[in-house]
């Protein structure tokens, strides 16, 4: 029996990364899910990531830790900075975590090299997104170039491909794709300030994009919201 090619999938526990995991599985790849505890205030997403990894048949799921909260600079890691509850007026919002995707992709790259995996999946999106600089196609292309210059696998002729299959999709299109692939979005948590039970605030930018996406897709929103 031929071994399936391997892929490392960054899995936050949210809607987009769950869809990425389903896409990688649908491509016939053996999936290894990597979640990162980086000091985020919405730690319920890590619990969600375990549910999603199990439901979508990841070969292995690991939760790695890195203390981005030590540096602060983001509403997601610094409790002194409030999470905005209105749509961002433009520019890079305070929910941007400095260098987060660079750090996480580097961790995924390290595990991929150990596994002999030539594919890394990340759920960044440049359409319905919040203005983050590390969610753009130029960033993904630049990271892939760096990855193949900086690793033993790359210089020995075994290049790594960084897949960002959602990058040009609307949130509604992402949801439709995931539903077609059997993703149970009721298992996921997107909210920036979800409570310990994973219930969403319904007011932050992540909640707004998620709610609007389900509405535009014409699909019932399975999100559990906190009582107001």
Curated annotation (Swiss-Prot):
Metabolic or biological pathway: Purine metabolism; 7-cyano-7-deazaguanine biosynthesis
Cofactor mode of binding and number, as noted: Binds 1 zinc ion per subunit.
InterPro entries documented for this protein: QueC, Rossmann-like_a/b/a_fold
GO biological process: queuosine biosynthetic process
Reactions catalysed according to its record: 7-carboxy-7-deazaguanine + NH4(+) + ATP = 7-cyano-7-deazaguanine + ADP + phosphate + H2O + H(+)
GO MF annotations, alphabetized: ATP binding; ligase activity, forming carbon-nitrogen bonds; zinc ion binding
Residue sites binding ATP per the record: 11-21
Nucleotide-binding recorded as keyword: yes
Pfam families: QueC
Keywords: ATP-binding, Ligase, Metal-binding, Nucleotide-binding, Queuosine biosynthesis, Zinc
Domain of life: Bacteria
Cofactor: Zn(2+)
Entry EC no(s): 6.3.4.20
Binding locations of Zn(2+): 191, 201, 204, 207
Family that this chain belongs to: Belongs to the QueC family.
Function: Catalyzes the ATP-dependent conversion of 7-carboxy-7-deazaguanine (CDG) to 7-cyano-7-deazaguanine (preQ(0)).
HAMAP family: QueC (MF_01633)
PANTHER family: 7-CYANO-7-DEAZAGUANINE SYNTHASE
Protein name, UniProt field: 7-cyano-7-deazaguanine synthase
Native organism: Azoarcus sp. (strain BH72)
UniProt lineage: Bacteria, Pseudomonadati, Pseudomonadota, Betaproteobacteria, Rhodocyclales
């Amino acid at each position: 029996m031929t071994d399936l090619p391997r892929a490392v999938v960054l899995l936050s526990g949210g809607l987009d990364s769950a869809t990425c995991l389903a896409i990688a599985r649908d491509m016939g790849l053996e999936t290894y899910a990597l979640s990162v505890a980086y000091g985020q205030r919405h730690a319920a997403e890590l619990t969600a990531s375990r549910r999603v990894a199990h439901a979508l048949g990841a070969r292995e799921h690991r939760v790695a830790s890195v203390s981005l909260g030590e540096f602060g600079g983001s509403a997601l890691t610094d409790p002194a900075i409030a999470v905005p509850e209105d749509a961002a007026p433009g520019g890079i919002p305070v929910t941007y975590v400095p260098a987060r995707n660079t750090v996480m992709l580097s961790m995924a790259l390290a595990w991929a090299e150990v596994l002999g995996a030539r594919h890394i999946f990340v759920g960044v999106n440049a359409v319905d997104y919040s203005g983050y600089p590390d969610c753009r196609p130029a960033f993904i292309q630049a990271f892939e170039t760096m990855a193949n210059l900086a690793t033993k696998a790359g210089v020995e002729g075994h290049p790594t491909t960084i897949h960002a299959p959602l990058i040009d999709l609307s949130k509604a299109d992402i949801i439709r794709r995931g539903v077609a692939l059997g993703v149970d979005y009721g298992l996921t948590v997107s909210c920036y300030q979800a409570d310990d039970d994973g219930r969403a605030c319904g007011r932050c930018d992540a909640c707004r994009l998620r709610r609007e996406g389900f509405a535009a897709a014409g699909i019932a929103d399975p999100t559990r919201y906190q009582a107001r």
